UniProtKB/Swiss-Prot annotation:
GO terms for biological process: NAD catabolic process; NADH metabolic process; NADP catabolic process. Its cofactor is Mg(2+); Mn(2+); Zn(2+). mRNA decapping enzyme that specifically removes the nicotinamide adenine dinucleotide (NAD) cap from a subset of mRNAs by hydrolyzing the diphosphate linkage to produce nicotinamide mononucleotide (NMN) and 5' monophosphate mRNA. The NAD-cap is present at the 5'-end of some mRNAs and stabilizes RNA against 5'-processing. Has preference for mRNAs with a 5'-end purine. Catalyzes the hydrolysis of a broad range of dinucleotide pyrophosphates. A divalent metal cation 3 binds at residues 193, 197, 238. This is NAD-capped RNA hydrolase NudC. Substrate binds at residues 83, 139, 211-218. PANTHER family: NAD-CAPPED RNA HYDROLASE NUDT12 (PTHR42904:SF6), NUDIX HYDROLASE, NUDC SUBFAMILY (PTHR42904). It comes from Deinococcus radiodurans (strain ATCC 13939 / DSM 20539 / JCM 16871 / CCUG 27074 / LMG 4051 / NBRC 15346 / NCIMB 9279 / VKM B-1422 / R1). InterPro entries: NAD-cap_RNA_hydrolase_NudC, NADH_PPase-like_N, NudC-like_C, NUDIX_hydrolase-like_dom_sf, NUDIX_hydrolase_CS, NUDIX_hydrolase_dom, RNA_Hydrolase_NudC, Znr_NADH_PPase. It catalyses: a 5'-end NAD(+)-phospho-ribonucleoside in mRNA + H2O = a 5'-end phospho-adenosine-phospho-ribonucleoside in mRNA + beta-nicotinamide D-ribonucleotide + 2 H(+); NAD(+) + H2O = beta-nicotinamide D-ribonucleotide + AMP + 2 H(+); NADH + H2O = reduced beta-nicotinamide D-ribonucleotide + AMP + 2 H(+). The gene is nudC. It comes from the Bacteria. Zn(2+) binds at residues 113, 116, 131, 134. Homodimer. Keywords: Hydrolase, Magnesium, Manganese, Metal-binding, NAD, Zinc.
């Protein structure tokens, strides 16, 4: 399976003690945005002296760091939203950009202990923040979320249940997704979210793959499921429109770097391999 661009590159090694070097790679972040040159390149040649630098690791032999930008973007550079960096950054760097944005935000939002208010300190040997007063330790947040492709029928009669949310483009439809609740299994989350968002029931829930999703700090767990009954009832405020689409007449789909798109592409590829249906 091809790697998602939101993943860490295969040749990246996590290293909290990586030393500085002249060829070091820097992800400079402010409010979830990356500092890029006007040519769309990452900054280089920065000094680490006196800066709240976060060691990420090594990309091959090249040290990689993240650090917050406290002022405005300098001349010849601009702050670019993480989503807008897709296709701009070289291959393999988008996933590290997501890691940098998440860790800078974690450091910013955990400057003080949530239990006693004492200034937090970096953990030793891990990504945690620790309180020197009461001993509280907190780690970078990862919010698990399920995403599921619901289908019915076989061969050329296969249909997918797709929806459009209030924050999506009006002509783009995607698969259903939602966060996992405390004490809930992933499979139970699939059944609950399907019932809440579109009002139908499903069966044959099967795990497919996962994808890190740094918007802002999710891990997508992808599933497929078969329709088991019920009428579509869109959840008010969460789902603008939901309907069945035949595989020969699909709407505009999400970008290729999303878990939703991979679920759909994999399902279509399976239909092609079955030999009884050709998709274009």
């Amino acid at each position: 399976m091809n790697r998602f661009p939101t993943e860490r590159p295969a040749d990246f090694v996590d290293d909290l003690k990586v030393p500085a070097a002249p060829d070091a790679l820097f992800f400079i972040v402010r409010e979830g945005k990356l500092l890029l040159s006007d040519a769309g390149e990452l900054p280089s040649g920065h000094s680490l002296a006196g800066q709240a630098v976060i060691a990420l690791g090594r990309l091959g032999e090249r040290p990689v760091f993240a650090l917050p930008l406290t002022g405005e973007a300098p001349a010849g550079a601009q702050l670019v939203g993480l989503r807008q960096c897709f296709g701009v950054l070289p291959d393999g760097l988008f996933g590290l950009a997501g890691l940098a944005v998440q860790l800078v935000d974690f450091q910013r939002s955990h400057q003080f202990c949530g239990a006693c208010g004492t200034p937090m300190r970096p953990g030793e040997g891990d990504r945690a923040r620790r309180c020197p007063s009461c001993g509280l330790r907190v780690y970078p947040r990862v919010a698990p979320a399920i995403i599921v492709l619901i289908s019915r029928g076989t061969g050329p009669d296969t249909e997918f249940l797709l929806l459009r949310g209030p924050r999506q483009a009006p002509d783009v439809f995607t698969t259903l997704a939602g966060f996992v609740e405390p004490s809930e299994t992933l499979e139970a989350a699939v059944h609950r979210e399907v019932g809440e968002e579109v009002g139908v029931k499903v069966r044959q829930v099967q795990y497919r793959f996962s994808q890190p999703w740094p918007f802002p700090h999710s891990l997508m767990l992808a599933f497929t499921a078969e329709y088991a009954g019920g009428d579509i009832v869109p959840q008010p405020g969460e789902v603008e429109e939901a309907q069945w689409f035949t595989v020969s007449d699909l709407p505009q789909l999400p970008p290729t770097f999303t878990a939703s798109r991979r679920l759909l592409d994999d399902a279509l590829a399976t239909l092609r391999l079955s030999g009884d249906f050709a998709t274009t």
